[in-house]
Swiss-Prot record:
Its EC number is 6.3.2.1. This is Pantothenate synthetase. The lineage of its organism: Bacteria, Pseudomonadati, Chlorobiota, Chlorobiia, Chlorobiales. The gene is panC. Homodimer. The keyword Protease does not apply.
Length: 288
């Protein structure tokens, strides 16, 4: 595995791979690698001859009250995990190389990024999309793999790629979960042992929503009421939002209609740790 820190070197390496007709896949991370990231790398390796892993803790997608300074940065451990997973190139630039002093341009992500995570974290999606665009250009990837746990982020990236006619296919990968259903996340390390036990209410609430769906309940208000009850059973849980949206446009819906994919979106603070998760809800025509 080759480790690259310089953006110009990364771009030249990617150009050389393209000239050799290598199919390139990129997996973008902020480091602190875990099983979820490894599943993205595995998916990339199944589809590409060359896999680039990027590790970059992007200052532009953290708000002033968020955890940029304390975000874990175990680069040596990450590099070892990446090597074992079969990554070909690890691109780990310093922030000043991605955002030099003269850097001025930023992506404006528009309507899809104004709600939910966008409302809770102003500027987050613009900062995220800016670095994703830059990393797509530097990696020259044919394919980019992102986790479905960050569902709104995935939707914003797909919208940007469509709008700018970027010749990279965006592939969503299923959320990887612990044995008790908690979505694997780098931020889980912030949870105390008691908070970790309580964090399972996110997955439990999604299971409750699906139970209601099987009972032919399609009223979103009633489903969310039940979801909220499950989450509220955890004494340290504070709900930021719990809502159901149409997966195609991230707009809230009142009634679930047949054969349309909806997402139950959750953002919940357990103690001081903010967790997000989502699950697909779909009513089949035969169940109506």
């Amino acid at each position: 595995m080759q480790i690259i820190n310089d953006p110009t070197e990364m771009q030249k390496t990617a150009e050389s791979l393209r000239l050799k007709h290598q199919f390139i896949a990129v997996v973008m991370t902020m480091g602190a690698l875990h099983e979820g990231h490894l599943s993205l790398i595995k998916l990339a390796k199944e589809r590409a001859g060359s896999v680039i892993l990027t590790i970059f803790v992007n200052p532009r997608q953290f708000g002033p009250e968020e955890d940029f300074q304390r975000y874990p940065r175990p680069l040596e451990k990450d590099a070892s995990m990446a090597r074992s997973a079969g990554v070909d190139y690890l691109f780990a630039p310093d922030p000043e190389l991605i955002y030099p002093e003269a850097f001025q341009t930023q992506v404006s992500t528009g309507d899809i990024a104004t709600r939910f995570e966008g409302a809770a974290r102003p500027g987050h999606f613009d900062g995220m999309a800016t670095v994703v665009l830059k990393l797509l250009l530097l990696s020259k990837a044919h394919l980019a793999v992102f986790g479905e746990k960050d569902a709104q982020q995935l939707a914003v990236i797909k919208q940007m790629v469509r709008d700018f006619n970027i010749d990279t296919t965006i592939l969503g990968a299923p959320t990887v979960r612990e044995s008790d259903g908690l979505a694997i996340s780098s931020r889980n390390i912030y949870l105390s042992s008691e908070e970790r036990k309580q964090a399972t209410v996110l997955n439990e609430s999604m299971c409750r929503a699906r139970e209601l769906l099987h009972m032919k309940q399609t009223d979103c208000k009633l489903i969310i009421e039940e979801v909220t009850k499950v989450i509220a059973s955890a004494p340290d849980a504070i709900i930021d939002y719990a809502t159901i949206v149409d997966e195609s446009n991230f707009r809230e819906t009142a009634i679930l209609k047949p054969d349309i994919n909806y997402l139950l979106l959750l953002a919940v603070k357990i103690g001081s740790t903010r967790l997000i998760d989502n699950g697909v809800l779909r009513v089949s025509q035969q169940d109506v």
